[in-house]
A protein has these predicted regions:
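Sec-dependent signal peptide recognition
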Residues: 1-7
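Short phosphate-engaging motifs
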Residues: 57, 104, 139
Length: 210
């Protein structure tokens, strides 16, 4: 079974202003079909963050993403996408999409990440996931219903398909408009991954205005 490659990000306190990023070095073109460039809903630029709850770099990256999201313009549609490489990751993906069906998703999402990395709760079973969400205020019957639902199964299946479509082999990764991929290997730092994302977003805005 394919194993995920964790990228060790280097922390950098110095940001390079207006850096010119280069395709093939800083980001990768993964699809040149123009029909896929723009999210069809409201014609927004789609940004996907591929992640896994057990990835320590994804956990740290969450704070960077949260601040970055607050600065985004209204033409951005941001999506978290859990990746699936084995049964444990599948379980965590089901947990993610279960939380998406609950009120206060962002709160549950943040607490789940925190519990995994700060409290060493690896969530290796459905029971451990359900018990945790219930301990955080979720209704047990609602959690169990959603966890085993066709909707959650479909969303996990779609995420698994996108894993291959986007050629994801490391996390975290950013996918922009189904067209560009930024991996940790290319970005090298958390800050730079978001700088490259901004650069590509500007490219997409300019291409749409032509």
């Amino acid at each position: 079974m394919k194993q995920i490659l964790f990228i060790l990000f280097l922390f950098s306190s110095t940001l390079q202003a207006e850096e010119n990023f280069v395709e093939g070095i800083d980001y990768e073109l993964i699809n040149d079909d123009p029909s896929l460039y723009v999210s069809k809903k409201n014609n927004k630029i789609k940004i996907i963050e591929a992640f896994w709850y057990g990835c320590p770099h994804c956990y740290v990256f969450e704070d960077y993403l949260a601040k970055w999201e607050t600065r985004k313009q209204g033409d951005i549609k941001f999506i978290n996408m859990p990746v699936v490489f084995n049964k444990t990751w599948l379980l965590h993906a089901r947990a993610f999409y279960t939380m998406k069906e609950l009120d206060n998703f962002k709160d549950f999402h943040k607490k789940f990440f925190y519990a995994y990395h700060e409290q060493q709760r690896t969530f290796a079973s459905k029971e451990s996931v359900v018990n945790f969400l219930v301990s955080q205020g979720a209704d047990k019957e609602n959690v169990e219903k959603n966890f085993s639902s066709e909707l959650v199964s479909k969303k996990v299946q779609e995420a698994n398909y996108m894993l291959e479509t986007y050629q994801i082999d490391s996390v975290p990764a950013m996918i922009i408009n189904d067209k560009y991929k930024i991996s940790g290997r290319m970005a090298k730092t958390y800050e730079r991954m978001l700088e490259i994302s901004d650069f590509i977003i500007d490219l997409e805005r300019k291409s749409r205005s032509k």
